[in-house]
UniProtKB/Swiss-Prot annotation:
It is found in: Cell inner membrane. Keywords: Cell inner membrane, Cell membrane, Membrane, Protein transport, Translocation, Transmembrane, Transmembrane helix, Transport. This is Sec-independent protein translocase protein TatB. GO terms for molecular function: protein transmembrane transporter activity.
Amino acid sequence: MFDIGFWELVLISVIGLVVLGPERLPHAIRSVMHWITTAKNMANSVKTEVTQELKLHEINENMIKASKQGLSDLDPELQKSIDEMKETAEQLSRPYKKDIDDIKTSLDKNPSGTTQQENSILDSSKTTPPRQDKNE
């Protein structure tokens, strides 16, 4: 990573031994190794995030291009993801399909949008209530 050879490491070790002494040198080496490990992990994390963002950006651009060109000649990976989304949407709507079909058929039979029970309630509400005497 830093392109440091064997003799450079020996020189750094000797200088560290002279400056820090034999008691504090192992602790200093552990601290430096911990910092280096943390820096490597952070760099790998940033690298994976950038890779994911670039892939998302590429997919987004492909989707925009596909919507402009139509869905005829898509990238196979993009076509696969679109098919998966359609299948998921279909699976989510399956439990409600029977209810939707029932509602459509009832609306086709009764275009006003009210059921027979609602019609009977509406008809009964149209009758005038019995007249009450003022003396009571």
